[in-house]
Design a protein with these regions (language model features):
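Active-site neighborhood of glycoside hydrolase catalytic domains
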Residues: 1-55
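Flexible loop/turn segments at secondary-structure boundaries
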Residues: 14, 20-25, 51-55, 139-141, ...
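Conserved alpha/beta catalytic core and glycan-binding cleft of carbohydrate-active enzymes
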Residues: 30-31, 40-189, 198-200, 253, ...
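Short acidic (Asp/Glu) and glycine-rich catalytic loops that position anionic groups and cofactors
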Residues: 9-12, 143-152, 200-208, 242
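The substrate-binding groove and active-site-proximal loops of carbohydrate-active enzymes
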Residues: 11-21, 150-162, 208-214
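Carbohydrate-interacting/catalytic domains
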Residues: 161-164, 175-189, 193-337
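Extracytoplasmic/secreted proteins, especially bacterial periplasmic and envelope-associated proteins
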Residues: 24, 28, 169, 219-222
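Alpha-helix termination/capping residues and helix-transition junctions
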Residues: 6-9, 133, 176-177, 322
């Protein structure tokens, strides 16, 4: 590993089935990388599970999800709890997540927004969490949505409105959460494998990226682009220290499938405060926001993301005392300085 860094300038390592390695080995790799010039900028993450029970020396502890508390806080893991709460189990094509009906996943989605870090969590810092909704294994996000929404299983090439709405909410959870966001290539244009959930054995016509879908799914592609711009613009969305988690305030909402939080900015941020509101229900709903240490909320907000568009340019303004969110949609609000 050190040779690859020094000779080939590799700046990141992903460990497949990291649970087959032991904690001591992984932590030693991290220490050795950190000792190099600029070594602390090298990314290190992996899958915190093993396909089979690991063969280790007596007393060794596997570097898996159940032992994340023993790993360096500079080693990140794919958080499959985030993946499951967003879209449902990857092992059941018809199971649903928060984005399409599983209201009981609200608490897990809140944890996802915090990167699963906190004083009572084995995750020390949000940057230990890789937030994602899909990867190379299992169904693509779009195919999973088609199946879970009980759509035509052959309609993978149709930008179904319900699936588009669910996909946008999934993207918002991943890209506006604390931690490290991860996307499967092509997720932003509804990548499909024609319903193949185990495509390592499949031909190129299944696994290829169909670039023509960028035109077909232009609305979704631009939505991902806009959410990335929002994350880049407002630094508290990508805080590495945990400060944002402590200042993030969730609203108390009695209706199911609604989540809302505010997050204050720093003095150098272009926004004094941001708010994220999700409504995965089938009804338009109103919400009252709360703030950190009762910091005054603005009288008006700029809407920078809604059901159709996302970005850093204001789409319109709304009054703080009259915030409504359409069914199966999100709002991202900004208090611009």
């Amino acid at each position: 590993i050190l040779y690859w860094v020094q000779e080939y300038h590799i700046d990141g390592f992903r460990f497949d089935l990291m649970g087959l390695y032991d904690v001591d080995t992984m932590n030693q790799i991290r220490r050795e990388l950190d000792s190099l010039p600029d070594g602390r900028s090298i990314l290190m993450y992996g899958e915190p599970w093993a396909a089979e029970p690991p063969q280790m020396r007596r007393g060794a502890v596997p570097a898996d999800k159940s032992h994340v508390r023993l790993l360096s806080d500079r080693i990140a893991i794919f958080n499959d709890d985030t993946r499951a709460c967003i879209k449902g189990s990857v092992f059941d094509m018809h199971s649903t997540g928060y984005i399409n009906g599983a209201w009981y996943q609200e608490t897990a989605v809140r944890h996802s927004f915090t990167g699963w870090a906190g004083p009572y969590s084995p995750v020390k810092l949000p940057t230990q969490t890789i937030s994602y909704a899909s990867a190379h294994d299992n169904f693509t996000l779009w195919d999973k949505l088609i199946y879970a929404e009980h759509k035509d299983p052959h309609g993978f090439d149709f930008p179904d409105p319900d699936c588009l709405a669910s996909n946008k909410i999934a993207a918002a959870i991943v890209l506006l959460s604390q931690g490290i966001p991860f996307m499967q290539a092509g997720e932003e244009f509804g990548r499909t494998k024609r319903g193949d959930g185990n495509s390592y054995r499949s031909p190129s016509r299944i696994n290829r990226l169909e670039w023509s879908r960028i035109g077909l799914f232009a609305e979704l592609t631009e939505y991902y682009r806009g959410l990335i711009q929002i994350r880049h613009t407002f630094r508290p969305f990508r805080c590495a220290t945990g400060k944002s988690i402590r200042r993030m305030v969730f609203s108390r909402i009695s209706e199911p499938q609604m989540i809302a939080f505010t997050l204050p900015g720093e003095a150098e941020d272009p926004w004094r405060m941001a708010a994220v509101i999700l409504n995965a229900s089938e009804e338009t709903r109103a919400v009252a926001l709360a703030s950190w240490e009762d910091e005054p909320l603005p009288k008006q907000w700029d809407v920078v993301a809604d059901a159709q568009h996302a970005g850093v340019t204001a789409l319109r303004t709304i009054e703080n005392d009259h915030i409504t969110v359409g069914s199966r949609s999100i709002l991202v609000l900004a208090d611009v300085r």
